[in-house]
């Protein structure tokens, strides 16, 4: 790397493998498992032979095989059933020639090929349903046949049970219908009562509004009468103003008509 390359810093924590958490015995999961009898070093799984004793690790899936295919290959049904190698049948035939069992091995391989073709894409697997458990005889491997008398008795009992059930259903339906009718009547009564109550409230509000309107009209009339009386009692401001002005005009005229008064105003002396 030259000096022009980008610098990348790597920082490692104090515990990169997280051993502090795995060795911590005070956490909830560790104490919870110890209550059920688990101890450090024991595995977790369905069977003690296939249980995991180490931590769960991430594995990279670098093939196009479906999930669980590798585990299925490990489960061998017989010495020929192993799908890990493509040319295993040829190898088995070579071993058969060396051991002198070529015919048995070839027959087994042929049956396996036929089974693969049958169980291929269009293969059909028959699965017995749990419904046939009562009619299936495991000793004779055949279906059980019951007599007609038993069937008739069962049919008669079933018919009686059905009649009783029908009567009970009818009675219950009648009771439900009656309850439904009562419930409807109660609802109608409640609606009527609510409507009457609303009407009564509306009438009370209307009467209150009318009384308020009458009171406001009376107060307006009385206020108008009082204002008219007060206006009649107010003196004429215009007349008083004119009387004062007329007095002032008279005094001014008298001063102008008097020569002595004019001389005093203009500060004229006779000397």
From Swiss-Prot:
Residues 175-203 have a biased composition (Basic residues). Keywords: Nucleus, Phosphoprotein, Ribosome biogenesis, rRNA processing. The keyword Phosphoprotein applies. Pfam families: G-patch. It is found in: Nucleus, Nucleolus. Transmembrane segments: none annotated. Residues 25-72 form the G-patch domain. One of its GO terms (molecular function) is nucleic acid binding. InterPro entries: G_patch_dom, PINX1. It comes from the Eukaryota. The modification Phosphoserine is found at residue 230. One of its GO terms (biological process) is negative regulation of telomere maintenance via telomerase. Residues 157-168 have a biased composition (Acidic residues). Residues 147-239 are annotated as: Disordered. Residues 204-221 have a biased composition (Basic and acidic residues). One of its GO terms (cellular component) is small-subunit processome. Interacts with EST2. Belongs to the PINX1 family. PANTHER family: G PATCH DOMAIN CONTAINING PROTEIN (PTHR23149), PROTEIN PXR1 (PTHR23149:SF31). Involved in rRNA-processing at A0, A1 and A2 sites through its action in U18 and U24 snoRNA 3'-end final trimming. Negative regulator of telomerase through competition for binding to EST2 with TLC1. Present with 3850 molecules/cell in log phase SD medium. This is Protein PXR1.
């Amino acid at each position: 790397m030259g000096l022009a390359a980008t610098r990348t810093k790597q920082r490692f924590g104090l515990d990169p493998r997280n051993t502090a958490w795995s060795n911590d015995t005070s956490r909830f999961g560790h104490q919870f498992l110890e209550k059920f009898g688990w101890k450090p070093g024991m595995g977790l799984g369905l069977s003690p032979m296939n249980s995991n004793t180490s931590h769960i690790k991430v594995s990279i899936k670098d093939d196009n095989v479906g999930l669980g295919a590798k585990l299925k290959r490990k489960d061998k049904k017989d010495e020929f059933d192993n799908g890990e190698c493509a040319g295993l049948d040829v190898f088995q035939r070579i071993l058969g020639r060396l051991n002198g069992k070529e015919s048995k091995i070839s027959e087994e391989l042929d049956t396996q090929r036929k089974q693969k073709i049958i169980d291929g894409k269009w293969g059909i697997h028959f699965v017995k349903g749990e419904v046939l458990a009562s009619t299936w005889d495991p000793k004779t491997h055949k279906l059980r046949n019951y007599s007609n008398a038993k069937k008739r008795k069962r049919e008669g009992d079933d018919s009686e049970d059905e009649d009783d059930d029908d009567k009970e259903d009818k009675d219950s339906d009648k009771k439900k219908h009656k309850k439904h009718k009562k419930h409807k009547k109660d609802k109608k009564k409640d609606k009527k009562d609510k409507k009457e109550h609303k009407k009564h409230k509306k009438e009370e509000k209307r009467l209150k509004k009318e009384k308020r309107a009458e009171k406001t009209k009376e107060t307006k009339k009385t206020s108008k009468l009082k204002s008219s009386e007060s206006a009649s009692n107010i003196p004429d401001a215009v007349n008083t103003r004119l009387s004062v002005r007329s007095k002032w005009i008279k005094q001014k005229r008298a001063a102008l008509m008097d020569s002595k008064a004019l001389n005093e105003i203009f500060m004229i002396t006779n000397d």
